[in-house]
Regions:
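Residue-level detector of extended alpha-helical repeat arrays and alpha-solenoid scaffolds
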Residues: 71-72, 107-110, 140
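Short inter-helical turns and helix N-cap capping residues of alpha-solenoid HEAT/ARM repeat scaffolds
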Residues: 67-68, 105-106, 135-136, 168-169
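Amphipathic alpha-helical scaffolding segments comprising HEAT/armadillo-like alpha-solenoid repeats
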Residues: 53-61, 84-100, 121-133, 152-165
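Beta-propeller domains with acidic blade repeats across secreted/periplasmic ectodomains
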Residues: 1-62, 70, 78-81, 156
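An alpha-helical repeat/solenoid feature that recognizes helix-turn-helix modules
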Residues: 107-119
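Structural signature of alpha-helical solenoid repeat scaffolds
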Residues: 80, 115-118, 148
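Hydrophobic core positions within HEAT/HEAT-like alpha-solenoid repeats
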Residues: 76, 111-114, 129, 144-145, ...
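Extended, hydrophobic alpha-helical segments in both membrane/secreted and soluble proteins
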Residues: 9, 139-150, 157, 161, ...
Length: 172
């Protein structure tokens, strides 16, 4: 799915019939032709283009709530590229503090804040602990991976990893 909400299909079909792993070396392989299909719903507007370029950090942090994955990812890239890790951690903590507890997407927003810190390698143990205790198992699973990655920089890494290892959901 593209940033506009359309589905894109890349069709680079090759007529080579080959049962080897090196078909990409075949001299008859077509390297120059292909099609990209763009599927949209008729009479439906496309997703609005988010403001990434020229946006200040508060607007970018708010983009972490976007329903579009591409928008959330681009906002994180921009924040990490233009700010120091400790600044990114402060932004993530501020974002989390402003979240509504009864928001149905609360755990996904927590996950996005932790992902922002992870992209910047801004170790934030309080946020990590909070995501490890989230209701959504996908957020807890992500937090477990981050706890493993940051284990050498966390004071309570064994405790956090033990919490994840004893989780009730098998994907965590």
């Amino acid at each position: 799915i593209g940033p506009d909400g359309a589905i894109y299909i890349a069709d680079f079909y090759n007529t080579i019939i080959c049962h080897q792993d090196d078909y990409f070396r075949d001299p008859t392989r077509d390297l120059h032709h292909g099609r990209i299909w763009r599927l949209t719903v008729k009479d439906q507007p496309l997703a609005p283009r988010p403001k990434i370029e020229g946006a200040d950090w508060t607007e970018l942090v708010e983009q972490l709530k976007s329903p579009e994955r591409w928008t959330r990812q681009q906002a994180k890239f921009k924040l990490v590229r233009h700010h120091k890790p400790f600044q990114v951690a402060d932004m993530a903590i501020g974002f989390v503090e402003d979240l509504e507890k009864d928001d149905p997407l609360h755990d996904r927003h927590l996950l996005e804040a932790l992902a922002l810190c992870a992209m910047a390698e801004a170790v934030e143990p309080r946020l990590l602990e909070r995501v490890l205790r989230a209701k959504d198992h996908r957020a807890r699973a992500f937090a477990a991976r981050i706890a493993g990655r940051w284990h050498d920089r966390l004071a309570n890494a064994p405790g956090m990893l033990k919490l994840a290892a004893n989780d009730s959901h098998p994907l965590v």
